[in-house]
Amino acid sequence: VGSEMCIRDRYIIKKNKYCLILALFILSFYLGRGVCALAKNTGKNTNSTVIVIDPGHGGSDPGKISTSGVMEKDVNLSIAMALKQLFENRGFTVVMTRTTDCDLAPDNSKHPKTDDLTKRTALMSKSNVAVSISIHQNSFEDSSSCGPQVFYYEASDAGKELASSVLGALNTSLCVANPRSIKPNKEYFILKKSTSPTVIVECGFLSNPAETLLLTDKNYQDDLAHAIYIGVTDYLAQSPSGHLQ
């Protein structure tokens, strides 16, 4: 909504105990002022649209771990569950690759990582799936790195369009001062193997202590989920395949 304050501005107001550190963080890396325009709801019937949401990692695979011990798998699941609720409230059919702290590999698997990813991509590749969204968190040796980033399979035009829509919504709603570009990739297993338009959404950097505070806050997780939801529904509304009917 055009009259709404930037999500990060609202977050600071709500989270007084983190006010100083977050204010410094935002002044360094984000606009921290102005109005953010969010995309409008399509208002269309979405009952026949299937969305796969994939909270990355899980079980014995924690993913990235912050210096304070925050595990990526837990943040991924929290954001993914918030995103699930948004889609279901709007009438979408949601398929989750996991809803608990687990992986998808069999207990006796000799190649647990490959088996886990294979099962995830099998869910993403069913014929009725409109899009697949894999939720992750980033990490980098430079602890000042921050902000969202979205990856897509380099040979997928639909994946590129989806990535652009999702990252655009994130950058707009988070008022990112120095937005990253969408990133083509030809190596990531789920991007390469999934037959539905698929993106990996890196919501932020667990290597950045200030951003870790944001990523572990429930209100901010809800805001991230809402931005991703807007990006996906905008993509579906404009998709020539007509998934949003």
Give the label of every model feature segment.
Residues 37-51, 57-162:
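Catalytic-core regions of hydrolytic enzymes
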Residues 127, 141, 179-245:
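Active-site-adjacent mobile loop/cap segments within catalytic or ligand-binding domains
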Residues 92-99, 134-136, 176-183, 239-245:
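Surface-exposed patches in mature extracellular/periplasmic domains of secreted proteins
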Residues 159-184:
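Active-site-adjacent substrate-binding region
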Residues 1-7:
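Short, small-residue-biased leader/transition segments that mark boundaries at the very start
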Residues 8-15:
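Short, Lys/Arg-rich N-terminal segment immediately upstream of the first membrane anchor
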Residues 19-33:
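Hydrophobic membrane-insertion alpha-helices, especially the h-region
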